[in-house]
Amino acid sequence: MAKHPVPKKKTSKARRDARRSHHALTPPTLVPCPECKAMKPPHTVCPECGYYAGRKVLEV
């Protein structure tokens, strides 16, 4: 019967939690559209009014 590796010591809560410190989710970055004030991702065309950088680029 094949033996498989097992942990020699129990992982502490501090070590376990430190390993998971990068797992947190970040909320999406949103900025108000200067034209219609709807929230949108930065550096993207506004899905509500179709403006980007002060001019109409998308017909909505």
Swiss-Prot record:
The keyword Ribonucleoprotein applies. Keywords: Ribonucleoprotein, Ribosomal protein. InterPro entries: Ribosomal_bL32, Ribosomal_bL32_bact, Ribosomal_zn-bd. Belongs to the bacterial ribosomal protein bL32 family. It comes from the Bacteria. Gene3D superfamilies: Single helix bin. Residues 1-23 have a biased composition (Basic residues). Part of the 50S ribosomal subunit. One of its GO terms (cellular component) is large ribosomal subunit. This is Large ribosomal subunit protein bL32. Residues 1-30 are annotated as: Disordered. One of its GO terms (molecular function) is structural constituent of ribosome. Transmembrane segments: none annotated. Found on the solvent side of the large subunit. NCBIfam families: rpmF_bact (TIGR01031). One of its GO terms (biological process) is translation.
